[in-house]
Each structure stands twice: as structure tokens, then as C-alpha cells.
Amino acid sequence: MIPGFSDPQRELEQYPTPPAAALELLERAWQSGDLVGSVADLGCGTGRLALGAAFLGAQVIGVELDEAALAVAREAAADAGLTVEWRCEPVENWAQHVGTVIMNPPWGAQRPGADRPFLQAALATAGSVWSLQPTVSDRFLRRYVEQLGGAVAGAWPVDLKLERTMPHHTRERKTVEGTLYHLHPVGAR
């Protein structure tokens, strides 16, 4: 089990990716042949997606702004005997080309537009992108991806079962309707 955030930052929208949603993303990406070669997990948090991709054989780079979250990810990787390159940097600095980006980025609930730099970086640097997003943002996401020169190659509903992790949460658990998107830059595949 990969631990969650020890001190989740509200402004960074740090929520651990629910295991079932992580499994869905990794399974679909793996079945599509997208976890072979170089993979980046943008906004990797404590490493749930990055470590899953590494377990499946990908050469993974986990990118995260929060050093404390990366410390948890590093420890989980060491405990599992997995190799991941961890980078503490803002996603806006990401420019390395990889075969695939996997991510559960901030959704913009606390900071409107927080998801945009992740989508921009992913579509600019990867041949294939797998992203978990709230279903309520579907129209925006499709338009924005098109504006960035990308295309939605697939979309699947995913229930995101979120546990209470922040002081402002009023319930112990909440299920959010999410969508797993498979995105391509125009001209890819």
C-alpha cells in the first residue's frame, strides 16, 4: 500500500488517487501499449501512479512540487524495490519528451485553472496522455485539449472514492464522478 499525504496541501489539491481509479488508468494504458519505455507522472504526489507504472515495467519519472510528498514516494519505491526518477519541480518547467504521461492533476477546485499547466505540459511532451479528471469538466476539457492541438482518443467513467483528508471536508467519504481520458496530440498515433 502506498501511503497518502502526511500533510495534504489544500492549495495544491493533494488527494491520493483512489486505488480502483489508479488501477483502471494503469490497466488501460498498459493494454494500449503505453507503459513501455519512458513514462512521466506529472503531479505524482506520493507516487501511486508512478510506482504502478514502474511495477509494470515502464521507465518512470515522477514530477511533483511538494518535497514532502516526494519523500513518501521515494520511501515507497525503495520498500517495493522499484526504480523511479523523482523530480521536485513545478509542472510548468516540464519539457522532457516521453512516450506517455499519466496523471491525476489538480482539478482547479481550489485554484481555477490549476489543471491547465498539466494538460499543456502533457500534450506538448508526450505521444499519449492518460488523465483522471472530474466528469463535470468534460465540455471544458474537450475544448481545451482541442485548443492545445490535441484530441480525446477515449473516455471512460470512473468513480473516485475520496476519503476525508482535509479539515474543510464535512464527510468521511465522498464519491466523485470522474472520467479517465486518453489524449493524443494532433498527429500522434
State each model region's role.
Residues 46-58:
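Conserved SAM-binding loop of SAM-dependent methyltransferases across substrates and taxa
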Residues 59-64:
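Conserved SAM-binding motif I beta-strand of class I
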Residues 81-91:
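Conserved SAM-binding strand-loop segment of SAM-dependent methyltransferases
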